[in-house]
Amino acid sequence: MGEPAGVAGTMESPFSPGLFHRLDEDWDSALFAELGYFTDTDELQLEAANETYENNFDNLDFDLDLMPWESDIWDINNQICTVKDIKAEPQPLSPASSSYSVSSPRSVDSYSSTQHVPEELDLSSSSQMSPLSLYGENSNSLSSAEPLKEDKPVTGPRNKTENGLTPKKKIQVNSKPSIQPKPLLLPAAPKTQTNSSVPAKTIIIQTVPTLMPLAKQQPIISLQPAPTKGQTVLLSQPTVVQLQAPGVLPSAQPVLAVAGGVTQLPNHVVNVVPAPSANSPVNGKLSVTKPVLQSTMRNVGSDIAVLRRQQRMIKNRESACQSRKKKKEYMLGLEARLKAALSENEQLKKENGTLKRQLDEVVSENQRLKVPSPKRRVVCVMIVLAFIILNYGPMSMLEQDSRRMNPSVSPANQRRHLLGFSAKEAQDTSDGIIQKNSYRYDHSVSNDKALMVLTEEPLLYIPPPPCQPLINTTESLRLNHELRGWVHRHEVERTKSRRMTNNQQKTRILQGALEQGSNSQLMAVQYTETTSSISRNSGSELQVYYASPRSYQDFFEAIRRRGDTFYVVSFRRDHLLLPATTHNKTTRPKMSIVLPAININENVINGQDYEVMMQIDCQVMDTRILHIKSSSVPPYLRDQQRNQTNTFFGSPPAATEATHVVSTIPESLQ
């Protein structure tokens, strides 16, 4: 066998501008050009010499649409020839056929939408030359126009062959613009089709990027018509052609080698019709079409390069557009993020400024409120000292002032003594007091605890705290009852003095008083208001004075009368005052008042031998000097006060002393 020389080439795009020109060319030339493009002529000649079997191509119908190509011989202007109807009449194939293995190359470019056309087609025969044998690449001379013209009457639809055989079928090459992106692939394992419903054995050839040799076990290949649509080629054989992996051809049997090309094959269908006889003179005509195939491969290669360049440009543009689009989207996203970050930054700056201002205000306020601890301690110490001075200071200061004010007090005034009522002593004492003190009692405190009389209020007077000892309620009620009874008995005495002539009425009143106050030594006597006044010439020692309430209103205001206090008012100056011999600084001074009272029962106590007196024990809450206007004093008490003052400070009258009068204000007027 000679060295196989595969013609590597690809078909141009179905959208080539010369695709639809020269549609009326000879179908024989187009068929041979196509076969020369796919096969190696040396292999075909060697196989045809050894071919011993006769093949029957009557039922061969290779219905496949192929891509158009350019022919320099048929058209000087390099126009593309497209053949619509091509008839091939090969010799009849041998009936004894075996399984073949046909492998088709797969698509190389994933982005291309057309199928790759195999670059090499090897057909070999063991016994005799096949009618479809082609020349090899070594014959570079171009065939003349006469053999080309002779092919037309032999294989044309209007002429007969030399043996009188007529073609039965036509091979139609139709260019279709539709592109199938995904080829169908068969597995490499052999498959035997035994279904009785299929009239003939079939194989499917698809494109692969490399050469896929066939395991040649039969000398002749029988092709059957394939479906009009799709990317598969169906070959009719007694057995199914098996797909095998690429490798070395094992035998010298006729081989159909399909080399993977670059150009993609569209959905074209080629119908190969076998000839009824094996004596068809095809060998001479096949040699004529060889230069046409060689000349067209160069143009196809250049077109493929241009097509690849255009595809690369399109891909580059598409990738550039996508990159620009992605970059634009990325930039837009960055701008949006930048705007959001700037706005958030501004907001955080504002919040930070607000917080700083608030912090400054709080710090300044703390600085203002902070006071050093030494100042606080000094203030506390000063407050404590002030309380101590106010509590203990004034008493000692007053005592020292009183001693300084009275340095020339006579020893007689510094001793404990009792006031007498003798005319001479009273006059001497009163004259001395008037001359020294200008008829006023000075504020003095004796060393031997004599009676203290306040003539004026001190500059800093602090009232003592109120004394609230534990007082029994029953005892309080008893004391109140005794005081009220003492006042009422004076009123009863006044009533008796009005009715001196009526002794019987006096006896009834005393008996009634004894019945009401039998449990008490002093009895409270109920009284009734009387509008009549008591005569001044009455001989009774006690006289209850009744007057209009209006005459006492000014007097009550002058003495600051309170409703919860008993008042004993005396305008006489001949009272017997007994000072306290001891003094307790922790308690209030106590005072006992002894005043005339009415005897409860004259049978028990003899009125001639005993004086009935009321003793009132109390604690001194407060002492002060009052200046009462003379006009506010009742008229009767005013005259009585004038008389008693003259008697107290002057010589005793020649006549008998005036009777003592104790005036009692009724409870109703109080």
Curated annotation (Swiss-Prot):
UniProt biased composition (Low complexity): 94-113, 123-134
Matches recorded under Pfam families: bZIP_1
Domain bZIP: 306-369
Outcome when changing residue 645 to I: Loss of glycosylation at Asn-643 and increase of Golgi translocation rate. Higher increase in Golgi translocation rate
Disulfide feature: none
Classification via CDD domains: bZIP_ATF6
Start and end residues of each stretch annotated as Leucine-zipper: 348-355
Cross-link (Glycyl lysine isopeptide (Lys-Gly) (interchain with G-Cter in ubiquitin)): 152
Keyword Transcription regulation: yes
One GO process term, biological-process aspect: eye development
Subcellular location: Endoplasmic reticulum membrane; Golgi apparatus membrane
PTM text: During unfolded protein response, a fragment of approximately 50 kDa containing the cytoplasmic transcription factor domain is released by proteolysis. The cleavage seems to be performed sequentially by site-1 (MBTPS1, S1P) and site-2 (MBTPS2, S2P) proteases. N-glycosylated; in its luminal domain. The glycosylation status may serve as a sensor for ER homeostasis, resulting in ATF6 activation to trigger the unfolded protein response (UPR).
Keywords: Activator, Disease variant, DNA-binding, Endoplasmic reticulum, Glycoprotein, Golgi apparatus, Isopeptide bond, Membrane, Nucleus, Signal-anchor, Transcription, Transcription regulation, Transmembrane, Transmembrane helix, Ubl conjugation, Unfolded protein response
Cytoplasmic side: 1-377
GO molecular function terms attached to this record: DNA-binding transcription activator activity, RNA polymerase II-specific; DNA-binding transcription factor activity; DNA-binding transcription factor activity, RNA polymerase II-specific; enzyme binding; identical protein binding; protein heterodimerization activity; RNA polymerase II cis-regulatory region sequence-specific DNA binding; RNA polymerase II transcription regulatory region sequence-specific DNA binding
Outcome (variant: residue 324 to C): In ACHM7; reduced ATF6-mediated unfolded protein response
Glycosylated position list: 472, 584, 643
Tissues expressing the protein: Ubiquitous.
This protein's record includes keyword Transcription: yes
Annotated stretches, region: Interaction with THBS4: 468-589
Spans annotated as Basic motif: 308-339
Disorder named in the UniProt entry: Achromatopsia 7: A form of achromatopsia, an ocular stationary disorder due to the absence of functioning cone photoreceptors in the retina. It is characterized by total colorblindness, low visual acuity, photophobia and nystagmus.
Quaternary assembly: Interacts with XBP1 isoform 2; the interaction occurs in a ER stress-dependent manner. Interacts with LACC1.
Family membership: Belongs to the bZIP family. ATF subfamily.
Protein name: Cyclic AMP-dependent transcription factor ATF-6 alpha
Gene name tied to this protein: ATF6
